[in-house]
Amino acid sequence: MPAPLFSHVPVLSEAVMDAGRQMPRAEGLLIDATLGGGGHSALMLEQQPGLRLIGLDQDATARAAAAERLAPFGDRVTIVATNFAEYTPPEPALMVLADLGVSSPQLDVAERGFSFRLDGPLDMRMNAVGDGATAAELIDRLEENELADLIYAYGEERLSRRIARRIKADLAVQGAYSGTAALAYAVAGCYPPQGTPRRIHPATRTFQALRIAVNDELGVLDRLLQQAPDWLEPGGLVGIISFHSLEDRRVKTAFLRDERLERITRKPVVATEEEEEANPRSRSAKWRLARKRLID
């Protein structure tokens, strides 16, 4: 059977499956808060026949692909069309799992507007049918200093003021950008020439900042970190895969300071050289795991 169009290789799968072996019981509920194509969930359901899954995703394409991938598990699987920040589970879970990365299929579809390598509309909304502002509307609405602050805060981009100045100047002269490629070209032009290839594309941090802002990703993550311990039964696990330092710092701090939780991973688990070679997306992935404290 051909793989679903949304399929991708789940990162740090060994760490996730190892966590599955540390759950307090072999039978119960797994909540995948970022279902995507269902890769991690499929591995967990195969490894743990007593698990039932509730998978959450606001992306209709992802839900359709996950439904196909998880069909062999029948009524053990429930897929819910929601953002995890807006969800309340029907019963306590053995484990809550979240993979915070933008999936390769989302990046590879130009129409979604996430990619600076493929020209598409400046959208960047995870929920493409929602009523939230697009990236194009965001950069048009913000003042130059506000845009610079956003790019610096969410993209950790040292040239944020130069980039914001260029963007607002372009908008004043030519109107809205024609698409993602035009914005990426403008951002790249803010960098001085360099003889050797750059490690990452010059537009990477700016696009990250806009995507985070459009989808309120850090606010949504904060709500998940606050809610997840209440979703768990005592001894249950919460495991999160992050892909940049803004996310990882939040996860690390929450796992350290939340009195409901006990850290299992003192340092984040990262990909092996072999996994990085096989799956380049894993290079920036970090896995942290915590356990809900037992009730005295």
UniProtKB/Swiss-Prot annotation:
Reaction(s) the record says it catalyses: cytidine(1402) in 16S rRNA + S-adenosyl-L-methionine = N(4)-methylcytidine(1402) in 16S rRNA + S-adenosyl-L-homocysteine + H(+)
Which InterPro entries does this chain map to?
A: RsmH, SAM-dep_MeTrfase_MraW_recog, SAM-dependent_MTases_sf
Asked if the record carries the keyword Methyltransferase, the reply is: yes
**Gene3D superfamilies, from UniProt?**
Putative methyltransferase TM0872, insert domain (1.10.150.170), Vaccinia Virus protein VP39 (3.40.50.150)
Query: One GO molecular-function annotation for this sequence?
Result: rRNA (cytosine-N4-)-methyltransferase activity
Primary location group? cytoplasm
Q: Which residues bind S-adenosyl-L-methionine?
A: 38-40, 57, 84, 99, 106
A GO-annotated cellular component: cytoplasm
* EC numbers for this chain: 2.1.1.199
Q: Where in the cell is it found?
A: Cytoplasm
Assigned keywords, A-Z: Cytoplasm, Methyltransferase, rRNA processing, S-adenosyl-L-methionine, Transferase
Any one GO BP annotation for this protein = rRNA base methylation
Q: What is the role of the protein in this entry?
A: Specifically methylates the N4 position of cytidine in position 1402 (C1402) of 16S rRNA.
Sequence similarity: Belongs to the methyltransferase superfamily. RsmH family.
Protein name according to UniProt: Ribosomal RNA small subunit methyltransferase H
What organism does the UniProt record list as the source?
Parasynechococcus marenigrum (strain WH8102)
Recite the lineage of the species.
Bacteria, Bacillati, Cyanobacteriota, Cyanophyceae, Synechococcales
What is the primary gene name for this protein? Answer: rsmH
